[in-house]
Structures are given as structure tokens and as C-alpha cells.
Swiss-Prot record:
The keyword Transport applies. Pfam families: Globin. One of its GO terms (cellular component) is hemoglobin complex. Residues 16-151 form the Globin domain. GO terms for molecular function: heme binding; metal ion binding; oxygen binding; oxygen carrier activity. This is Globin CTT-III. Heme b binds at H73, H102. PROSITE patterns: GLOBIN. Monomer. CDD domains: Mb-like. Belongs to the globin family. There are at least 12 different components in Midge globin. Coiled coil: none annotated.
Length: 151
């Protein structure tokens, strides 16, 4: 059964076309230099995500946005996401790393869906997302589908 799930995950990641991958990478290149803005959008979309981080729990998002700890954490998250985008379609190891660190923390599917929504909202506001929406949809469906199958 585990082999079947692994095979399906690999097939899903491999199903991304070269054009989809190129489109996603090009649009992400336009925003990856704003990790604080991306993390802010995600936390704003779902404060329960921010509450999962002990250094931010119970704090006002507006007051921590410009702080060094927030910037450091934003760089980590967006850096990891940059790694995933750069390695498309070969993301199985990154998915395993993500699941290994997030499953024990009790991260829910709803929170991951809300992370996705916050990220997409940021992309729509900062890029020509309409031209990349189908490629992003396929990529995010693949990424989160792989995660959900393991969590």
C-alpha cells in the first residue's frame, strides 16, 4: 500500500508539464524576494497558523511584521518554498521533510489549505497571476496532495 501511495505521488509530481513548471518558477521569481510580505499575507489570512509558532503566538501581527525574528522566520519558510519550486517536479524529498516537521506539530489540512489561500492571495496582488493561475493550481494541487496523503 505504501508503495502505491509513493507511486501515485511521484506520478502526480511528474504530471506537471515543463510549461507549467517554467510558468510557476518565473512567477515565483518575481516575489521570492519579499518573504516578509508572503508570510504576513499567510498569517493575515489565518491567524491560527501564526499561533502555531511559539515566538509569535498571542502577539499582534502588525507589531511583529517588521521585527528581526519575523524576517528570519519568513526567510526560512520562503527559502524552503523556493527550494521546492526550484526542484519541480522532483519534490518527494521536500514533501517528506515538510511532513516530518509539521505532522508532529499538529498542523491541520485546514491550516495548510488556508496557507495556500493566503499565498495565492499574495500572488494575485503582486504578480500577473491570471496568466499563471492554471500552472499554480496544478502545482499546488500536486504539492498539497502529496502532503495530505502523508498527514
Amino acid at each position: 500500500m505504501k508503495f502505491l501511495i509513493l507511486a501515485l505521488c511521484f506520478a502526480a509530481a511528474s504530471a506537471l508539464s515543463a510549461d507549467q513548471i517554467s510558468t510557476v518558477q518565473a512567477s515565483f521569481d518575481k516575489v521570492k524576494g519579499d518573504p516578509v510580505g508572503i508570510l504576513y499575507a499567510v498569517f493575515k489570512a489565518d491567524p491560527s497558523i501564526m499561533a502555531k509558532f511559539t515566538q509569535f503566538a498571542g502577539k499582534d501581527l502588525e507589531s511583529i511584521k517588521g521585527t528581526a525574528p519575523f524576517e528570519i522566520h519568513a526567510n526560512r519558510i520562503v527559502g524552503f518554498f523556493s527550494k521546492i519550486i526550484g526542484e519541480l517536479p522532483n519534490i518527494e524529498a521536500d514533501v517528506n521533510t515538510f511532513v516530518a516537521s509539521h505532522k508532529p506539530r499538529g498542523v491541520t489540512h485546514d491550516q495548510l489549505n488556508n496557507f495556500r489561500a493566503g499565498f495565492v492571495s499574495y500572488m494575485k496582488a503582486h504578480t500577473d497571476f491570471a496568466g499563471a493561475e492554471a500552472a499554480w493550481g496544478a502545482t499546488l494541487d500536486t504539492f498539497f496532495g502529496m502532503i495530505f496523503s502523508k498527514m
